[in-house]
From Swiss-Prot:
Protein purpose: Component of the autophagy machinery that controls the major intracellular degradation process by which cytoplasmic materials are packaged into autophagosomes and delivered to lysosomes for degradation. Involved in an early step of the formation of preautophagosomal structures. Binds and is activated by phosphatidylinositol 3-phosphate (PtdIns3P) forming on membranes of the endoplasmic reticulum upon activation of the upstream ULK1 and PI3 kinases. Mediates ER-isolation membranes contacts by interacting with the ULK1:RB1CC1 complex and PtdIns3P.
Any Gene Ontology CC annotation: cytosol
Highest taxon of the lineage: Eukaryota
Residue(s) carrying Phosphoserine: 395
PANTHER family recorded: WD-REPEAT PROTEIN INTERACTING WITH PHOSPHOINOSIDES WIPI -RELATED
Gene name of the record: Wipi2
Keywords in alphabetical order: Autophagy, Lipid-binding, Membrane, Phosphoprotein, Repeat, WD repeat
Positions of WD repeats: 182-222, 228-267, 311-349
Protein name: WD repeat domain phosphoinositide-interacting protein 2
Similarity remark: Belongs to the WD repeat PROPPIN family.
Gene Ontology MF terms in the entry: phosphatidylinositol-3,5-bisphosphate binding; phosphatidylinositol-3-phosphate binding
Quaternary structure, from the entry: Interacts with TECPR1. Interacts with ATG16L1. Interacts with ATG5. Interacts with WIPI1. Interacts with WDR45. May interact with NUDC. Interacts with ULK1 and RB1CC1.
Any Pfam family: PROPPIN
Length: 445
């Protein structure tokens, strides 16, 4: 979640970025002063597990599961991606691109770099560029989603700037898998489930959430977030078991939907006048316009969360902490909110804790009463905020780091420049160990 405003200013607490890792076990936060990682193993305490202040103005920071591999982009060099081993404090490699980096996605097979009109697919084991998807429709928000499943390793991105088409790309076989006509309006949010077999979508209108099978593109579920007003969807997130889907927006309500097939009950003859009227009403839907009929068949929220603010950009996560299902919301006001979810009854979720993203903690009573952190929403994306630097020529570059400045990098034919690794670090990094997954081949040519 990018938090920079149009002028490049950070959100509350100098925040520029916040995101959960792939299995929702940690939270990454980028700020004017660097970046931090927090463990999400406890509700009572937000444990800071790492802090880096060597790189300023971190606008993108993505961690690979619970490994030491991290991808970083800074506002000071918005076209440059650095891949680092954060526990050792070493840089593995770097790449420069022809335009501003808007998003980076990781799984154990691939690293995706999203520019406004192109997508770069890297092999995460050696960081080579495997494929480039060029001339994509303008995507200034950097909207894309990457499945975390090794077998169903799909990438989803907008196929149109005017309607809600989703392009699904197979990043293993490097070929297009499907095009899904998901919405009439342009896309606003995308999310895969953990198995990579379901894709949730929302449009800029924000009233309907749809779930499709992947790669077939068959519509499995359709949920109505609301009718009264159009909203800006900030985030979609599946639970790890794929049973629940959360949708957050710029309103004070987060909706949680339950993905279960509706069991058809055998028809019963009505015994009252109201029962008879209801039967006639349902029968009459076959004569109504298709848009109205769809509203009768759309699912409603299984559970809801009432946030103590309205208008903040945010990102949500459905996870299990201390054996209890939780909804986590990281917001541009500089706070992480933790709610309990009742998986049987649903209803309104209880707010358990609120933590400042600088590591301090506030109790629930302080949350409700305090309004000092209720700052305006950072509505503009990082892509519109970052200043465009000079064009990076397609020629070999050198790493400008002291004694290593003589080490030549390489240029990929597909347009990304860089990728050189430091020879001294190649022997020090033991990324073939299980604790340092994935194994990477560090090239020193």
């Amino acid at each position: 979640m990018n938090l920079a405003s149009q002028s490049g200013e950070a959100g509350a607490g100098q925040l520029l970025f916040a995101n959960f890792n792939q299995d929702n076990t940690s939270l990454a936060v980028g700020s004017k002063s660097g970046y931090k990682f927090f463990s999400l193993s406890s509700v009572d305490k937000l444990e800071q597990i790492y802090e880096c202040t060597d790189t300023e103005d971190v606008c993108i920071v993505e961690r690979l599961f619970s490994s030491s591999l991290v991808a970083i982009v800074s506002l000071k060099a918005p076209r440059k991606l650095k891949v680092c081993h954060f526990k050792k404090g070493t840089e593995i490699c770097n790449y420069s691109y022809s335009n501003t980096i808007l998003a980076v996605k990781l799984n154990r097979q691939r690293l995706i770099v999203c520019l406004e009109e192109s997508l770069y697919i890297h092999n995460i084991r050696d960081m080579k560029v495997l494929h480039t998807i060029r001339e994509t429709p303008p995507n200034p928000a950097g909207l894309c989603a990457l499945s975390i499943n090794n077998d169903n390793c799909y990438l989803a991105y907008p196929g149109s700037a005017s309607i809600g088409e989703v392009q699904v790309f197979d990043t293993i076989n490097l070929r297009a898998a499907n095009m899904i006509p998901a919405h009439d309006s342009p896309l606003a949010a995308l999310a895969f489930d953990a198995s990579g077999t379901k894709l949730a979508t929302a449009s800029e209108k924000g009233t309907v959430i749809r779930v499709f099978s992947i790669p077939e593109g068959q519509k499995l579920f359709e949920f109505r977030r609301g009718v009264k007003r159009c909203v800006s969807i900030c985030s979609l997130a599946f639970s790890m078991d794929g049973m629940f889907l959360s949708a957050s927006s710029n309103t004070e309500t987060v909706h949680i939907f339950k993905l279960e097939a509706v069991r058809e009950k055998p028809p019963e003859e009505p015994t009252t006048w109201t029962g008879y009227f209801g039967k006639v009403l349902m029968a009459s839907t076959s004569y109504l316009p298709s848009q109205v009929t769809e509203m009768f068949n759309q699912g409603r929220a299984f559970a809801t969360v009432r946030l103590p603010f309205c208008g903040h950009k945010n990102i949500c996560s459905l996870t299990t902490i201390q054996k209890i299902p939780r909804l986590l919301v990281g917001a541009s006001d500089g706070y992480l909110y933790m709610y309990n979810l009742d998986p049987q009854e649903g209803g309104e979720c209880a707010l358990m804790r609120q933590h400042r993203l600088d590591g301090s903690m506030e109790t629930t009573s302080e949350i409700v009463d305090s309004a000092s952190h209720d700052c305006p929403l950072a509505t503009q994306t990082y892509g519109t905020a970052a200043a465009k630097g000079a064009y990076v020529p397609s020629s070999p570059t050198r790493l400008g780091k002291g004694q290593d400045a003589n080490l030549e990098a390489y240029t990929d034919d597909l347009g990304a420049v860089g990728g050189a690794c430091l020879e001294d670090e190649a022997s020090a990094l033991r990324l073939d160990e299980d604790s340092e997954h994935p194994p990477m081949i560090l090239r020193t040519d």
